[in-house]
Amino acid sequence: FNTWVGYEVISPAANFNYSVSYLFSNGPFSHLGVKADFALSDDVSLMLAVTNPWDTNDISGSGEYALGGQLGAYGQYLNLYYDSGTNGGLGFEIDYTGGFDVNEDLFLGVNAAYNNNPETDSGFYGAAIYPQLSTSDDFAIGLRGEYFAFTQDGFDDVPVFGLTLTGSLTKENLIIKPEIRLDSFLNDNEPFLDSDGVATNSLSSFLIAAIYSF
């Protein structure tokens, strides 16, 4: 089953932005195991899970397992994941996912996470906001603003700031999404290449995605 951790999901039809966040890319994607959901009240829920280590969708060759949980209340969710961090494991991650209806046309989504792997002395942390404005029944525009940083003991953090502006036009089962994305790494990190093949700290991109659901 798909992960309970994070604001964004694997299916592009369910995400507002077409490209995915750093928070999504560095968390778990899917799990093989069992989970139990409990409705504590009309507005409060609890989920507990025992799975193979993250993204191990077959037999756990290491013989290890992972634990997970989710507490939901009034549309806000606190998510937990833990494995030992060995054999390529993720370690410990705590994640908050939620959102608020500012008015009938404006929604504000929020995601924040912290990860630590004691085996590799590494991890990450970050936060993202997702304001989304519906301008008509067929069209909406949304922004993702994200701050994310990789961590490694003994080294400076590697932070990145990202902005993604997405339009979403829906016609029956078809969604058209034009999108502009800007990524900028800080602390003199230059992971990208410009048009001349020279290392640079920033990247701008544009795409138009067509998503058909059936």
Model-based region annotation:
Residues 1-72, 78-82:
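Surface-exposed coil loops of outer-membrane beta-barrel proteins
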